[in-house]
Amino acid sequence: MCIRDRICDYQAYRQEVEIPQIKSDPFESCKTQNPHFSMGIFMRMLYSCLVDADFLETESFMKNNHVERTSGEEMASLLARLERHIGSWLENDDLNSINGRRTEILKACLIAGENDRGLFHLTVPTGGGKTIASLAFALKHAVRHQMEHIIYVIPYTSIIEQNAQVFREILGQDNVLENHCNVDYGDSEELKPMQLASENWDKPVIVTTNVQFFESLFASRSSKCRKIHNIANSVVIFDEAQMLPLEYLKPCIAMMENLMDFYRTSIVLCTATQPALDSIFDQHRRYIELCPNINEQFKFFKRVIYENLGIIEFDTLIERLKTEKRALCIVNTKKCAQQLYEQLSGDGVYHLSTSMYPKHRKKILAQIKERMSDKSKSCVLISTSCLLYTSPSPRDCS
């Protein structure tokens, strides 16, 4: 018996499915500098739809239609949640206060959410309320254009954990998906919907890393590609956009432009130090700055005086830190951070590292916040992330 005799006849679909005839070239009117790249992305999007549909149908069949997935609330509902959260803030119009300045930026972002889809910059100085302002813009923009997802792309997992917690407090636990290498939803029945959503990003707000985002778009594995069709019709916010890796910048920018041109996506480059990306984007592409009166904001929020300590010995750094009542010391390596902590170890001295489990880091941060609330107590933190006494540190993993 030949193999053809053992294959079932599936031609019955011809009576069940009517496939419309394509009368014109769907790409004929598309103008792009790199048509081959654009066609490649289109094929990947189709593949993503196919793979996700196949997984979902198989899952439904195997579980007899008892699927544990929940997609979360509509964007309009999430916007209402945010508006309730920030309602009292909007009454503050005192531009001589920090909160008044934050309100000015927040209001501008809410108004800008009514703009057409496209490229946006949010250049906000440290302390200007960038996280909430960007969320306000994204929700307003998503409701205005009936967009389905808001995707935060962030280089550091430590920042992701903090931002995701803020979003959950405002929007609710079930509406925010945190997706990176440090997240393990395990076998918990309570977290099962999140574990399933991490496979295809079927949640209204997704917080992930640069690596996870771009690897999914360029990957050759079905498990990675499965989620990318849900990037279409989304607001994608690149927090700390200056951290996009230089060696991969051109393909990353090309992907952003393709998402904006063909997949109803808006891009927000969000940072306290806007990188010079304008020359890399298409010269005809214009962007809208979301932050009002940028120069004034940076002058107002300038609360740090930088001092170059030069090259100093390890023991000198220890002695300097011992004289500080409150300090954050960031070093290059986990080993160096551990050595400093051991030398300084005592009441009010803390250590943070990406070697710790996320729950452990959160516990330490909670202890630090509690101690900082008492101004009479000293607090010194040795860390491998970045703020003061800093040396260049590597980016976190995906």
Annotate the PLM regions:
Residues 1-3, 389-398:
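Single conserved hydrophobic/aromatic residue that forms the stacking wall/gate
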Residues 4-81:
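Accessory nucleic-acid engagement/destabilization modules that flank
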Residues 149-169:
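Conserved Walker A/P-loop ATP-binding site and its immediately adjacent core
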Residues 159, 324-343:
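Conserved strand-helix element at the start of the C-terminal RecA-like helicase core
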Residues 175-215:
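Inter-Walker segment of RecA-like/P-loop motor cores
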Residues 190-203, 358-380:
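Conserved motor-coupling elements within RecA-like helicase/translocase cores
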Residues 244-294:
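Post-DEXD/H (motif II) to motif III coupling segment of the RecA-like Helicase ATP-binding lobe
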Residues 274-320:
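Interdomain hinge/linker at the junction between the two RecA-like core domains of SF2 helicases
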